[in-house]
Amino acid sequence: MQYPEPIARLIDSYMKLPGIGEKSATRLAFYTLGMSDADVDNFAKSLRAVKRDLHYCSVCGNITEDDPCPICKDKTRDQSRVLVVERSRDIMAMERMKEYHGLYHVLHGTISPSEGTGPQDINLESLLKRLEAHKEIQEVIVATNASLDGETTAQYLAHLIKPAGIKVTRLAHGLSAGADIDYTDEVTLFRAVQGRTEM
């Protein structure tokens, strides 16, 4: 027996989300069916608002409603340091720590030869232009994940940035291999930032 078309389309839509297979998508679709009209309307409005109201900061690449984002606009932050992360949600993890007060740059991915992702496919060019335009930046802290692709990206960044005389450091390896920054607790992140090593 096939599901009615609206349910089948909703299942297909949920399956486009990362980590959601057919069983989970079916469960979510039927849960949605049982929600009140008001809750479904609010859910739909939230989805539309994310696409309509959010965009990438023209300076750092973080998700924001304003341009530049609140972090880039905050002149009380340490303007001499830029912490480079893979995704916007990594910034949220670092900010929860409340110990890093510098700036950020979001790559929106990593260099991954196995996935066919090269330097031109990530937000790298804007980082290089930013470093060239803002001579007050003295240190780039590379906070890509401790995976093969994260390490490849970190080495590539160091290779590009060090010749400009900017200090390049890497988070200490208190992070386990393959660990995602956004799933790491604040104490471990704090130790990783404090114990960063020069590349």
From Swiss-Prot:
SUPFAM superfamilies: Recombination protein RecR
Zinc finger (C4-type): 57-72
Keywords linked to the UniProt accession: DNA damage, DNA recombination, DNA repair, Metal-binding, Zinc, Zinc-finger
GO molecular function: DNA binding; zinc ion binding
Residues covered by the Toprim domain: 80-176
InterPro entries per UniProt: DNA_Rcmb_RecR, Rcmb_RecR, Rcmb_RecR_Znf, TOPRIM_dom, TOPRIM_RecR
GO terms of biological process kind: DNA recombination; DNA repair
UniProt family annotation: Belongs to the RecR family.
Free-text function comment from the UniProt entry: May play a role in DNA repair. It seems to be involved in an RecBC-independent recombinational process of DNA repair. It may act with RecF and RecO.
Record protein name field: Recombination protein RecR
Species in which this protein is naturally found: Limosilactobacillus fermentum (strain NBRC 3956 / LMG 18251) (Lactobacillus fermentum)
